[in-house]
């Protein structure tokens, strides 16, 4: 009965003492509340009964405390049971001290306590830099049992040790729980110093490890380059190869020698600007260079060429993620006004402990216009120690003001040889077996991006024990060169069925049509350029043996053109497989004879002189010598051969027969890469039919001549049989007018008269020229004063060919200006008993020609 009454009195006293300690500590955090009770706590023992809570007993000797600890079934571990003084006197090695473990079972009736002083693997853990244990986090979530692990940081004196042992409110150790919500943004706010209270509410207190190294800026180490201060490793978890082998110094950058040299010179000479702009393709090292440059700006090493050294306090704090003067951000955050204001305020203040305050903005092309305006307006108000490093892969999207106020550095694509060397080093360091051909293939497919190459290498290392070329083909989804050469050989050998089967197999299992046609084009270009690999396969050598002649090379060039045209159709088509199959079948349609005819025709055209003959209204005005007549005969033979070649190349047999029987090539002029071909037809129906097929005719001319072609179609009408009425002539004129506007190429539509006999008068005819949908004015020439209008004629056989002419303007009247409309007149042949005056009165207006400033005068 007395024992029960004694415990009932002790419990309120114990609670009162605990409350008093907490109130004093909260009221005055700088004061150690237990220091007032140091004399009482020198010999103290905490004990809890099985059912009666905590009782405080004072003992006079530490031995009694140890003896009482053995009798106490449950409670705190007594102070006297540890030989702390012996360990402190021997050197206070934290790694040799064991931590105290309290295991609280869920059973309220039976509790047991255990302590361990030496078995660290089961009952405790070492104190190393206050780093949280991953195993503890995993054990925190176990059900049915609540187990907590405390780590104790020893003090430097016995009195302080006793006070901290008695009151956990002033302890500076760090506890981590699996359900603990850590706010990393408030690490600088240390609070009152309370790590956790007795209500078991966990609180995070950031470690102030920088205070351990502030007194040693260069950290001389132990003589072997190692630092005395132990820092946590930031490569604990396994990462991808691109992250693991990210450059940490300028020497590790690949393929950017010019940029590295310029940045090192900037640091050496101290010519630091406010804004740097790193631009270039993705995966070329822009972001890594910005981080290295930021660390080099604040590095404390005396040797500028070795910055960042990685040994000084600034380098260690930055690379461990604790640098306060280097901030990395992205465009998404900066587009928020609150975050932007915070950044501007921070940039206006001097750095905390470093030399420069560096702001790295990645993907800066995503910043909005308002953000750019605010940054540029505030740039002059920033501290002179603030440096901005902008990183972008799309330079054209940045405002011009940013480009003019920044120092730009272009990061070019990394060459395949450098990428291959880097990948080989990674494989050797990681112990990965590889084929050199596979590494070279990865480098060629990375398109100058080292990061993409490292990612592909990382994926291949997960697929098998050895990286091979076939494995790389399967991963990337491309076809090997041997398979491409087999398909190309089948397509060019007119093996239709096998070509279709092979193409469908490739597209069904490995590759899409767009990528297949691109690979075929690349293989053909390599063969034409003469690029041969050192270790060429048997398939490649066999293909090169068959296709080495000039005729086969011409076939390959034609195949490249067909594939280029097919790629345009594939981009706009939903059925890409069909279009690609059609393109492959077209590779064997053209035989060698057509190519030989093509080349011969072009060589003859290049040797020809300009074919244009002059004529006048009367025969005999121009007397030709025998040499000129012989040259003209040769030219006529050349024109006839060209015309025959053009008609033979027409796809339609009916069009081929029509052009050969009903049409004639009368003149062909090649000037400055443009050929002008004049065709003659004898009826309006023939002209209309030729106009409907003008595209096919133009394609045939371009295939033979190899240059742009302007087609002029002339209608030859005999003066003895003029149109029966003016209405028929007008309909003929407007019919030709409508056809000319539909033509894509520049065309000449001319109505001609045949003047074989000298007694016939030439009839005035109509000429139209279309240029981008406009009808142009032709030259007007007056050959005599008796005629009201006269034509400038151009014919190789003395025929009178008329151009668009203007009516005769009597003296005293104003001549129309160049930009005014020109009238087109119809003049009929003179009959018996009619004079020029009578005929001019019978002329009537049948059309109006639009002016064009580009027309030739």
UniProtKB/Swiss-Prot annotation:
Q: Which stretches does UniProt call biased (Polar residues)?
A: 834-843
Q: What is the top-level taxon of the source organism?
A: Eukaryota
**Which ranges form a coiled coil?**
544-576
Annotated SUPFAM superfamilies: P-loop containing nucleoside triphosphate hydrolases (SSF52540), post-AAA+ oligomerization domain-like (SSF48019)
Q: Where is this region: Disordered?
A: 593-629, 787-845
Under CDD domains, the record lists:
AAA (cd00009), HLD_clamp_pol_III_gamma_tau (cd18137)
For this record, the Gene Ontology CC terms, alphabetical, are: DNA polymerase III complex
Please state which protein family the record places this protein in: Belongs to the DnaX/STICHEL family.
Q: What is this protein called?
A: Protein STICHEL-like 2
């Amino acid at each position: 009965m007395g024992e029960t009454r004694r415990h009932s009195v002790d419990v309120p006293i114990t609670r009162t003492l605990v409350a008093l300690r907490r109130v004093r500590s909260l009221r005055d955090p700088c004061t150690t509340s237990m220091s007032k009770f140091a004399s009482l706590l020198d010999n103290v023992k905490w004990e809890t009964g099985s059912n009666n809570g905590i009782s405080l007993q004072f003992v006079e000797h530490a031995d009694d405390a140890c003896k009482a600890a053995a009798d106490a079934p449950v409670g705190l571990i007594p102070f006297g049971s540890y030989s702390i003084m012996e360990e402190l006197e021997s050197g206070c090695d934290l790694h040799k001290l064991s931590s105290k473990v309290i295991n609280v079972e869920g059973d309220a009736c039976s509790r047991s306590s255990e302590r361990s002083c030496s078995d660290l693997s089961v009952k405790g853990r070492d104190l190393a830099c206050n780093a949280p244990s991953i195993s503890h986090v995993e054990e925190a979530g176990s059900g049915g049992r609540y187990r907590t692990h405390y780590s104790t940081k020893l003090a430097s004196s016995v009195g302080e040790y006793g006070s901290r042992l008695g009151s956990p409110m002033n302890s500076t150790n760090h506890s981590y729980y699996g359900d603990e919500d850590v706010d990393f943004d408030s690490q600088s706010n240390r609070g009152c110093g309370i790590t956790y209270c007795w209500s078991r509410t966990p609180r995070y207190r950031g470690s102030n490890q920088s205070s351990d190294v502030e007194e040693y800026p260069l950290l001389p180490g132990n003589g072997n380059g190692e630092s005395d201060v132990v820092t946590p490793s930031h490569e604990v978890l396994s990462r991808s190869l691109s992250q693991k082998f990210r450059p940490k110094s300028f020497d590790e950058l690949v393929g950017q020698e010019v940029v590295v040299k310029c940045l090192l010179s900037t640091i050496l000479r101290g010519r630091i600007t406010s804004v740097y702009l790193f631009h270039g393709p993705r995966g070329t090292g822009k972001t890594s260079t910005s981080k290295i440059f930021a660390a080099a700006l604040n590095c404390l090493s005396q040797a500028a060429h070795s910055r960042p050294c990685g040994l000084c306090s600034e380098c260690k704090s930055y690379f461990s993620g604790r640098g306060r003067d280097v901030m990395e951000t992205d465009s998404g955050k900066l587009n928020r006004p609150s975050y932007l204001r915070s950044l501007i305020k921070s940039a206006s203040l001097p750095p905390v402990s470093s030399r420069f305050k560096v702001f790295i903005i990645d993907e800066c092309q995503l910043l909005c216009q308002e953000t750019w305006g605010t940054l540029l307006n505030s740039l002059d108000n920033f501290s002179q120690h603030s440096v901005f490093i902008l990183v972008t892969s799309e330079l054209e999207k940045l405002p011009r003001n940013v480009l003019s106020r920044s120092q730009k550095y272009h990061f070019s694509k990394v060459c395949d040889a450098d990428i291959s060397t880097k990948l080989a080093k990674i494989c050797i360091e990681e112990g990965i077996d590889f084929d050199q051909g596979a590494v070279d293939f990865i480098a060629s497919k990375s398109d100058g991006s080292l990061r993409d190459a490292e990612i592909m290498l990382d994926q291949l290392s997960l697929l098998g024990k050895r990286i091979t070329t076939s494995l790389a083909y399967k991963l990337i989804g491309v076809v090997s060169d041997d398979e491409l050469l087999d398909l190309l050989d089948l397509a060019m050998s007119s093996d239709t069925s096998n070509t279709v089967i092979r193409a469908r197999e490739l597209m069904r299992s490995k590759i899409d049509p767009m990528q297949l046609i691109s690979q075929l084009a690349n293989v053909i270009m390599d063969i034409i350029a003469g690029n041969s690999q050192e270790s060429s396969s048997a398939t490649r050598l066999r293909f090169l043996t068959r296709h080495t002649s000039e005729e086969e090379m011409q076939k390959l060039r034609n195949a490249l053109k067909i594939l280029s045209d097919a790629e345009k159709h594939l981009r706009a088509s939903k059925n890409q497989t069909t279009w690609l199959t059609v393109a492959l079948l077209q590779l064997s349609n053209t035989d060698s004879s057509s190519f030989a005819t093509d080349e011969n025709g072009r060589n003859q055209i290049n040797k020809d002189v300009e074919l244009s003959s002059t004529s006048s209204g009367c025969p005999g005005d121009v007397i030709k010598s025998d040499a000129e007549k012989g040259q003209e005969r040769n030219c006529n033979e050349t024109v006839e051969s060209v015309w025959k070649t053009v008609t033979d190349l027409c796809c339609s047999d009916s069009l081929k027969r029509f052009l050969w029987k009903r049409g004639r090539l009368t003149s062909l002029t090649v000037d400055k890469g443009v050929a002008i071909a004049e065709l003659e037809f004898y009826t309006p129906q023939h002209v209309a039919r030729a106009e409907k097929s003008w595209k096919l005719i133009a394609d045939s001319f371009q295939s033979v001549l190899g240059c742009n072609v302007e087609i002029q179609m002339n209608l030859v009408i005999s003066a003895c049989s003029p149109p029966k009425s003016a209405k028929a002539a007008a309909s003929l004129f407007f019919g030709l007018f409508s056809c000319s506007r539909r033509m894509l190429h520049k065309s000449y539509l001319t109505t001609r008269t045949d003047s074989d006999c000298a007694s016939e008068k030439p009839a005035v005819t109509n000429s139209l020229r279309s240029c981008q949908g406009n009808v142009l004015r032709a030259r007007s020439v007056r050959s005599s004063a008796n005629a009201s209008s006269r034509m400038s004629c151009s014919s190789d056989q003395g025929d009178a060919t008329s151009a668009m002419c203007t009516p005769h303007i009597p003296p005293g009247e104003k001549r129309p200006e160049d930009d005014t409309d020109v009238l087109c007149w119809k003049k009929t042949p003179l009959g018996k008993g009619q004079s020029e005056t009578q005929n001019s009165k019978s002329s009537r207006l049948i059309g109006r020609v639009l002016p064009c400033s580009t027309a030739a005068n």
